[in-house]
Amino acid sequence: MTVFLNVFDVHVNRMPCTGTVEGVSYQPGQFLVASKPEATLRNEQNAVMLNTESGAKVLCVQVAGLIARRIVCWVGQGDRVQRGERFGLIRFGSRMDTFLPLGSKICVSLGDRVKGGETIVGELR
């Protein structure tokens, strides 16, 4: 699931569920337009692996874009986090990719606008 942020959006990233941060991995890279498919592999990014209370793994990837040249992450390995908690930001747009386990229910559709801390985007099953 990908949420694109433009320069006018709120750039704070929030945890999709409650759990413990299993690891954080920063990868330097390019600053291609975030909507391009190759940005997934080539752009600067920061991945946060979350181990949920139910044992499911959820991966949140902050991806920098053409204008966004700074990723900030406030969590580290072993941190306990709550659903909706702010964990980072991407300055001036870009995108957030969230990978849920197979079988999870996606609660939004392509083109929907979401609001941080309010919109339920998916449910773990």
Model-derived features: positions:
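Contiguous, well-folded functional domains in the mature portion of proteins
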Residues: 1-125
